[in-house]
Amino acid sequence: MKKISKLRGMQDIEPLQAKKYDFIEMEFNSISKSYGYDEVRFPILENTELFKRSVGDESDIVNKEMFTFESKSGKSMTMRPEGTAGSMRMAIENGLLDSGQQRISYKGPMFRYERPQKGRSRQFQQLSLEAYGFNAVSYTHLTLPTKA
C-alpha cells in the first residue's frame, strides 16, 4: 500500500513548534490589544474575484500563485493568499467601518502555490495589523519576537 504524506509545501506543526507558535501568537495578541487593535477572523476560502480585484487581475499572485478551484455549483473559490483583501471585505460587509476608524488584527494560515524552498512554504502563517479610516497615517512600530 502506498504511503500517504502531506502535500508538497504544506506544514505539519509538531508539539514543540506549536508551543513556539502559541508564544508568538500570545505576544502578538497582547501587544496588538494594548495598541487598540481588535481581533477579527474571516474565512480561509473567499470568492476568487475578491483577489483579482484587490491585487490585480494580471498580478503574479492571481495568475501563478493562488490555490483556486470551482465549487460543485461552479463558483470560483480561492484559498486566501494574503489577509488584507479578506479583512477589508469583512470590514465593509459587516459594517465595521461605519463608525469611521477601525483598528483590527488577524492571524492565520495563508496559501500560495509557489515553488517550495528553504524559508518559503505553500502554507504559511501571517500575523497582521490593519488600520482603516484614519486621515493622517501615524505609524506605531510594534516589535514582535521572530524567534521563540
Task: Locate each region found by the language model.
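TRNA-recognition modules of translation machinery and tRNA-sensing kinases, especially anticodon-binding
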Residues: 1-142, 147
